[in-house]
A protein has these predicted regions:
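Conserved beta-strand/loop scaffold segments within soluble protein domains that form the structured core
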Residues: 90-317
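N-terminal leader/transition segments
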Residues: 1-145, 152-154, 163, 309, ...
Length: 317
């Protein structure tokens, strides 16, 4: 879905990558990054075939969609009541809006996805719907996937994402935009697992309206290079955000988690816990930014980071 809509996005993304070049350590967000690994991702050709992976059956009652960057994930699928594809005008209006709201539409990983993704899964959620499972697999080359979910007022969704990859010459670029209407509830799980050498860059942009609840739990392990970036904005405050993350690194892997939460209104809540386990010569990074401007009175934000070093040669920042 969205090939026609994404063509100008791809052109703008490619132009942006040429203009920006690769990030440098002079930029605070990339100061600790192994830029050689980033350069290796930039050199990868786009994956030319859909990867095949052996995965267990979907949970009972859940809807599983496969995102491989090559095919329309909705082809031949009957969606349950409450889940509908966005129309073309709706997609043109909504695509990229949450990225803009979160201030990350022109970041390098997002521009890489803009330049590379040829399909977008765009769904509207009404009421309470069955659990949704999105499975993405990557093998040789760069696999780029993009998802847009609009939760209407009082909608409820349980979303599980599984990102898999094999081989040092494979990388996964993923961008997810989420808009939660008033009193909407989203429980979001992300499991990203690889064979030890592949690369991952995942951006999760979330826009919350008042009295909405967003709970995000992520587990990242096995990637030679991994960068996960959840970014949340509570547009008028009065919303609840819960972020729980675990990064497990070994060998010479580098796993980074960069989060940003902004409160644009009063009475917002944040509960965040990030855990890292680092062994061998691995390196884990956590950077959590919280923005509470003057209008965000009575904000209650809690953030904790816990680390476990399994080797005296491992590093945590």
């Amino acid at each position: 879905m969205g090939r026609g809509v994404l063509e100008p996005v791809q052109e703008r993304g490619r132009a942006a990558l040429e203009r920006l070049g690769l990030p440098t350590r002079r930029e605070e967000a990339w100061r600790l990054t192994d830029l050689k690994r980033l350069e290796a991702i930039a050199r990868l050709p786009l994956s030319s075939s859909a990867a095949e992976a052996t995965i267990p059956p979907a949970a009972a009652g859940a809807l599983r969609l496969v995102l491989d960057g090559q095919r329309d994930p909705l082809h031949g699928v009957d969606l349950p009541e409450g889940l509908t594809p966005l129309t073309l005008p709706e997609l043109e209006q909504a695509l990229g809006h949450t990225l803009d709201q979160c201030g990350c539409s022109d970041s390098w990983p997002v521009e890489l996805n803009h330049a590379s993704a040829s399909h977008v899964l765009a769904l509207r959620v009404r009421g309470t719907v069955p659990p949704l499972e999105l499975v993405s697999t990557a093998e040789a080359g760069l696999t780029a996937t993009r998802v847009l979910l609009l939760l209407e007022e009082k909608a409820e969704l349980e979303l599980m994402q599984v990102l898999l990859a094999n081989g040092a010459a494979s990388a996964h670029s993923h961008v997810l935009e989420l808009h939660l209407g008033q009193e909407a509830q989203l429980r979001h799980g992300l499991l990203a697992s690889a064979d030890g050498d592949a690369s991952l860059m995942a951006h999760v942009a979330v826009e919350q309206e008042p009295r909405s609840h967003f709970s995000f739990t992520s587990v990242v392990e096995g990637w030679g290079f991994g960068r996960v970036e959840p970014r949340v904005v509570q547009v008028d405050g009065q919303a609840h955000t819960r972020l729980k993350g675990l990064a497990v690194a070994s060998s010479q892997q580098q796993l980074a988690t960069h989060t940003a939460v902004r409160f644009d209104g009063p009475d917002g809540e944040l509960d965040q816990l990030q855990k890292c386990i680092a062994g061998d010569r691995s390196h884990t990074i956590f950077n959590g930014a919280i923005s509470v401007p003057r209008d965000a009175q009575r904000t209650n934000a809690a953030q904790l980071s816990r680390n476990l070093l399994l080797s005296d040669r491992a590093r945590v920042d």
